């Protein structure tokens, strides 16, 4: 059942027609701002991948991808959940060099998504990935990238309000960095979502770090993360305070991606050792894929 909520007395400041114009404006402006901030080039994205390639995003490990047979090639296609792993392989195939990356306007179907104000069965999102050096696999580089993304979002918002004066969204460019363990230590009796809401009410733009591994108090992860793309020690969510919903509003789930060692640990930790035999995972564990952030 949908958990959609509409605050009492809420009215959108734009007509349906204006809303479509604003969406077009955001998309055209943000892709330029993001590309310049992170040195990215736009590429085309697949709608589906081959089932046994290991390229689809397993999300939390329980979501069922939309699948269909392709008789002419004797394979099964899966509509993507995200392009987290496909992008890394694309960077290798397209021969991107360190410091450069790609972005794409991704469409996906997540049939088992819990639908609410922020989540839909249909996904339309920017997906990006960038080649890095091994020495870039650190928290300082992660924070630097987060600040660049927040800057691109804020610049898009500034331009949007000039084009559509009835919009008055205020975004805080100052990012507050905090780990999931620090939130659990501060609010041990809160649910993960309640912790996110609480910290966003205090600091309106937050990067919540280290999502996926088990927390010390509860023994459970703050939120689910697949073991084969993000390095759980070097990832996080950019979340902003949404005054209309009075809640945290996730705008980006991102991170420095697994290398050979962190993927080995995370696959074993989550009981996913069977994935080691998939083509993507074999390439990564043998060092054939570039190190990336995305």
Regions found by a protein language model. Give the residues of each.
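Class II aminoacyl-tRNA synthetase-like tRNA-binding/catalytic domains
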Residues: 2-119, 127-131
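Generic recognition of stable, solvent-exposed alpha-helical segments in well-folded globular domains
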Residues: 18-21, 25, 29, 137-144, ...
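Hydrophobic/aromatic-lined pockets within catalytic cores
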Residues: 31-42, 147-158, 212, 216
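A glycine-rich phosphate-binding loop feature that marks nucleotide/adenosyl-phosphate handling sites
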Residues: 47-51, 165-172, 211
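Flexible, active-site-adjacent loop/turn segments at secondary-structure boundaries
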Residues: 66, 101, 107, 116-121, ...
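Extended, charged alpha-beta segments that form solvent-exposed binding/catalytic grooves
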Residues: 99, 104-197
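A translation/RNA-centric and nucleic-acid-associated enzymatic feature enriched
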Residues: 179-294
